[in-house]
């Protein structure tokens, strides 16, 4: 595994790559290992440069997410949420219920899967909010979630009523 740090407006970001895929992107983590940059990490840093300049870059970085089948499905849905838009945990729970052929699905189960996302920002877990648009649960702190959403043009006053 290769690790390196990226300094961003939301704090230090730790990037992890297996040499072929991005396998981790964590906000606020320090790297105690020797830094090693490969082509995936270099591509990710360029993507982050573009994102933090206010652009909406296409995600063309190979990502490998390790998790349960349920988590994988939730993370796939996260990747479909457009830049600057939000979905509620309930929205994703309803979509998961349809995918799994169930009558309903727990928004809490979805929230737990969202919270385990190992590649934040690129797999945009910050775009998931509470039922009425309230900012809830973000592994890196609600302030960072709010910053990322505002950076993408979202305003809480325009949220779900």
Give, region by region, the residue ranges found by the protein language model:
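Terminal helix-turn-helix DNA-binding modules in bacterial transcription factors
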Residues: 117-118
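Short glycine/proline- and charge-enriched loop/turn segments
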Residues: 27-30, 129, 142
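Basic nucleic-acid-binding alpha-helical/helix-turn surface characteristic of O6-alkylguanine DNA
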Residues: 1-105, 151-161
């Amino acid at each position: 595994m290769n690790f390196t740090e990226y300094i961003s407006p939301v704090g230090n970001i730790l990037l992890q790559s297996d040499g072929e895929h991005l396998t981790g992107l964590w906000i606020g983590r320090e790297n105690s290992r020797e830094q090693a940059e490969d082509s995936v990490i270099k591509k990710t840093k360029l993507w982050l440069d573009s994102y933090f300049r206010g652009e909406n870059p296409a995600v063309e970085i190979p990502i490998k997410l390790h998790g349960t089948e349920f988590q994988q499905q939730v993370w796939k849905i996260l990747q479909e949420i457009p830049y600057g838009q939000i979905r509620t945990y309930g929205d994703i729970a309803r979509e998961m219920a349809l995918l799994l052929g169930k009558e309903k699905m727990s928004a809490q189960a979805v929230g737990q899967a969202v919270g385990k996302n190992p590649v934040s920002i690129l797999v945009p877990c910050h775009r998931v909010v509470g039922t009425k648009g309230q900012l809830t649960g973000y592994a890196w702190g609600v302030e960072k979630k709010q910053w990322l959403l505002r950076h993408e043009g979202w305003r809480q006053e325009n949220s779900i009523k």
